Amino acid sequence: MALAAPESSKNLGLSSLPTIAAIATPLGRGGVGVIRLSGTHAYSIACTLTGKSAFKPRMASFCRFYQADGTVIDEGLVLYFKGPHSFTGEDVIELQGHGGMILQNQLLARVFELGAKQASAGEFSYRAFDNDKLDLVQAEAIADAIDATSAAAASSAIRSLSGEFSQKINQLLEQLIHLRLHVEAAIDFPDEEDVDFLSDGVIQGKLEQTQEKIQQVLATAKQGQLLRDGIHVVLAGRPNAGKSSLLNRLAGQERAIVTDVAGTTRDTLQETVVLNGLTLHLTDTAGLRETEDTVERIGIERARTAIAQADMLLMVYDVTRDLEEESTPLQLAEQLFGELPEAKRLLIIANKSDLLNNNSSKEITSISQQEIHNRGYEQVNVSCETGAGIDDLVETLCAKVGFHPPENSLIARTRHLDALRRTAEYLAEAHEQLTVFKAGELVAESLRQAQHSLGEITGEFSADDLLGKIFGSFCIGK
């Protein structure tokens, strides 16, 4: 359930917002189940539920949880976090009972009877954001830590949650604010010699320093986005080229059926793996060819859809048979895909390279590789049978998408990259207005737009529909 334009405690006052509750642990059978409450009435609900008159903040209390008629629902621990010293900034109660959906649902129903409302997806985190306990980057990092598919992604998300990414953005915002102050002062007081920024070079130097730092943060964010999202890789080629065998090699297990019969793979098959720290969302596809088989034809249509949506294409071909006389891998790619994909999006995989056992075949392959290199493409020779070349393939793939995660990488999202790019564009405009046109008012406006774009990252400038979309993607109970 999406969180649509949540009401702000800053507008309504904390006491006007309903007390919310939700199961905070995963659904299903478990040793412990946690129900979280947040709001003005969380404390009184806990007292009524347990028959206790008081709870000490940050102290665990063993209690029984009662129905209205005195029947015991469950027993467990109550933790009380008094606002504003809590995750949400409000009074927060955690009820830790036994796991299992029957007991959890009975306990949650009783909490609702006592006046709490069902929390929307991400509503606890939204209240933390709304009460300045988290900025938007930190709030997103909670979801990213939960959804991390690799150890590197998880540790990067925790660094973002601790505020490292936000600190970089806030430092840049502070620089932009100082730049704007100097520029606008020069506009307002044009007769003052000490603010003649159009000719003294001071503002230009500060602007160029800010541009350089934006590019540094953007480079870090690109790595963070790759860590978070990974890349979607489609394996494509003719039937029996070795696509399914390559998927199995990369996955480290027999995920796809492999036979000598052409057309064995008739549908797309997805597998997610983490190699060299990069998450690869792999899709094996039906071999591309003309066919009268209805089922295979549907599989080929799905393959072409996957190809169109892929971040990276691995065109797998059998070096012993797939290249017709005088044809090259690039010509084969053009035949298979209808047009030659961009070099940054295509990696050519020469399978069964271990079977090149005569000089003429090796010479043809060498000539093909030279043509591939001259046109800016890359080919990796592999053997899916022996595993030779697979490590080279992974390293080449990581390099091709620009994945070189630094030790202290920070998780980032597509919207962060978009905001940073727009900020860089506005700064470039400001630089041009300053150095070419000497137009102070236009410099100030470009800097204002740059500040606004950068502020979107931490939530300083964010529309309600954006906030609803972000927090609506969270788990219930977060």
UniProtKB/Swiss-Prot annotation:
<feature type="binding site">
    <location>
        <position position="264"/>
    </location>
    <ligand>
        <name>K(+)</name>
    </ligand>
</feature>
<dbReference type="InterPro" id="IPR005225">
    <property type="entry name" value="Small_GTP-bd"/>
</dbReference>
<feature type="binding site">
    <location>
        <position position="94"/>
    </location>
    <ligand>
        <name>(6S)-5-formyl-5,6,7,8-tetrahydrofolate</name>
    </ligand>
</feature>
<dbReference type="InterPro" id="IPR025867">
    <property type="entry name" value="MnmE_helical"/>
</dbReference>
<feature type="binding site">
    <location>
        <position position="240"/>
    </location>
    <ligand>
        <name>K(+)</name>
    </ligand>
</feature>
<feature type="binding site">
    <location>
        <begin position="240"/>
        <end position="245"/>
    </location>
    <ligand>
        <name>GTP</name>
    </ligand>
</feature>
<keyword id="KW-0963">Cytoplasm</keyword>
<dbReference type="Pfam" id="PF10396">
    <property type="entry name" value="TrmE_N"/>
</dbReference>
<dbReference type="InterPro" id="IPR006073">
    <property type="entry name" value="GTP-bd"/>
</dbReference>
<comment type="subunit">
    <text>Homodimer. Heterotetramer of two MnmE and two MnmG subunits.</text>
</comment>
<dbReference type="Pfam" id="PF12631">
    <property type="entry name" value="MnmE_helical"/>
</dbReference>
<feature type="binding site">
    <location>
        <position position="244"/>
    </location>
    <ligand>
        <name>Mg(2+)</name>
    </ligand>
</feature>
<keyword id="KW-0547">Nucleotide-binding</keyword>
<feature type="binding site">
    <location>
        <begin position="259"/>
        <end position="265"/>
    </location>
    <ligand>
        <name>GTP</name>
    </ligand>
</feature>
<comment type="similarity">
    <text>Belongs to the TRAFAC class TrmE-Era-EngA-EngB-Septin-like GTPase superfamily. TrmE GTPase family.</text>
</comment>
<dbReference type="GO" id="GO:0005525">
    <property type="term" value="F:GTP binding"/>
</dbReference>
<dbReference type="GO" id="GO:0030488">
    <property type="term" value="P:tRNA methylation"/>
</dbReference>
<comment type="function">
    <text>Exhibits a very high intrinsic GTPase hydrolysis rate. Involved in the addition of a carboxymethylaminomethyl (cmnm) group at the wobble position (U34) of certain tRNAs, forming tRNA-cmnm(5)s(2)U34.</text>
</comment>
<dbReference type="GO" id="GO:0005829">
    <property type="term" value="C:cytosol"/>
</dbReference>
<feature type="binding site">
    <location>
        <position position="259"/>
    </location>
    <ligand>
        <name>K(+)</name>
    </ligand>
</feature>
<feature type="domain" description="TrmE-type G">
    <location>
        <begin position="230"/>
        <end position="402"/>
    </location>
</feature>
<dbReference type="InterPro" id="IPR027368">
    <property type="entry name" value="MnmE_dom2"/>
</dbReference>
<feature type="binding site">
    <location>
        <position position="261"/>
    </location>
    <ligand>
        <name>K(+)</name>
    </ligand>
</feature>
<dbReference type="GO" id="GO:0046872">
    <property type="term" value="F:metal ion binding"/>
</dbReference>
<feature type="binding site">
    <location>
        <position position="265"/>
    </location>
    <ligand>
        <name>Mg(2+)</name>
    </ligand>
</feature>
<dbReference type="Pfam" id="PF01926">
    <property type="entry name" value="MMR_HSR1"/>
</dbReference>
<keyword id="KW-0460">Magnesium</keyword>
<dbReference type="GO" id="GO:0002098">
    <property type="term" value="P:tRNA wobble uridine modification"/>
</dbReference>
<feature type="binding site">
    <location>
        <position position="36"/>
    </location>
    <ligand>
        <name>(6S)-5-formyl-5,6,7,8-tetrahydrofolate</name>
    </ligand>
</feature>
<feature type="binding site">
    <location>
        <position position="478"/>
    </location>
    <ligand>
        <name>(6S)-5-formyl-5,6,7,8-tetrahydrofolate</name>
    </ligand>
</feature>
<keyword id="KW-0630">Potassium</keyword>
<dbReference type="InterPro" id="IPR027417">
    <property type="entry name" value="P-loop_NTPase"/>
</dbReference>
<feature type="binding site">
    <location>
        <position position="133"/>
    </location>
    <ligand>
        <name>(6S)-5-formyl-5,6,7,8-tetrahydrofolate</name>
    </ligand>
</feature>
<dbReference type="InterPro" id="IPR031168">
    <property type="entry name" value="G_TrmE"/>
</dbReference>
<keyword id="KW-0378">Hydrolase</keyword>
<dbReference type="InterPro" id="IPR004520">
    <property type="entry name" value="GTPase_MnmE"/>
</dbReference>
<dbReference type="InterPro" id="IPR027266">
    <property type="entry name" value="TrmE/GcvT_dom1"/>
</dbReference>
<keyword id="KW-0479">Metal-binding</keyword>
<feature type="binding site">
    <location>
        <begin position="284"/>
        <end position="287"/>
    </location>
    <ligand>
        <name>GTP</name>
    </ligand>
</feature>
<keyword id="KW-0819">tRNA processing</keyword>
<keyword id="KW-0342">GTP-binding</keyword>
<protein>
    <recommendedName>
        <fullName>tRNA modification GTPase MnmE</fullName>
        <ecNumber>3.6.-.-</ecNumber>
    </recommendedName>
</protein>
